[in-house]
């Protein structure tokens, strides 16, 4: 606390582990129910939604809400948030896919929610099967772990565990046709039998209702959703209850559905009243007023996530794209060529690019069909 640093950094965590390597294990006795959230996209938002819903029910919760999700970040969050004189009802820990198993070496676990698995940061994780194996290694260390899984993602649905609960989308309705933009970026997966999976419905990427001629198919979700998308929010109908979500995009509707499913499993009350008051974490569909102007901040870091964000862009707005390649961002920015920045070729105003890899972004926009005169990569 004397450093003045927050739970959003990892510096305190590094100091704490040097002073006491068993710190994480010692935290177990101060928390009643321990929840982890992992997956490629949506971890921070989903974990934030769960924490918000728990707090709205009158229960106490600790979390790493600022998104520091590796081992030192988790230790950091717990060290500045836990009260050693009063037990906390819940911990909600967003966990990096590669660090989940390391966290589970020292930290107990009751629930794990897995959002999705997409190709992401190939320089860190390699292929998707590597990411899946890292998560499965963590699951295997906790035989009593309750899994809350996205049934619409064939990789997520195939995780092995003794206690699995599924959530999924039945239908998606668009209040505005501009929100329904199609993309060609899709992931193709094979059934365990080796044949390509087929789909009766596909919502985005590999998310949908899949099946194989061998009989393998999407598991039946306990929590089934009908999603209605609007320009500034969405409505999710889950088992005859309507939940208003103050977030844009189908990807955020999936995040909210996962949070609702997990909180239902916990027996959390007042979800319908609490959900509309949710405030997002920095950079995740965050709305700010800068110099009096309405500003929407989105995070993109892989093709699938970028495409879903690009679908929501108002083409009449001023656009700034910042691309970095620090370790946490992923060194490999070749994913820019797999994301469909063609969505931006008919924007009204100039597009400003910035960050360490601004030139790469400018080149990508050029090949996406954005007029050269509209691409601004020097704002000095």
Language model feature labels by segment:
Residues 281, 299-377:
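Active-site beta-alpha connecting loops in nucleotide-dependent enzymes
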Residues 88-91, 143-147, 293-295, 346-352:
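Short active-site oxyanion
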Residues 106-119, 206-220, 244-276:
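A conserved, hydrophobic alpha-helical segment in the catalytic core
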Residues 44-52, 226-240:
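Acidic-glycine-rich active-site phosphate/pyrophosphate-binding loop
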Residues 50, 54, 74-78, 256-266, ...:
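Buried hydrophobic packing segments
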Residues 1-168, 173-189:
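Phosphate-binding loop of NTP-binding sites
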Residues 228-231, 262-300:
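Gly/charged, well-structured mid-domain segments that form the phosphate/adenylate-handling core
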Residues 169-235, 246:
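Cys/His-rich short segments
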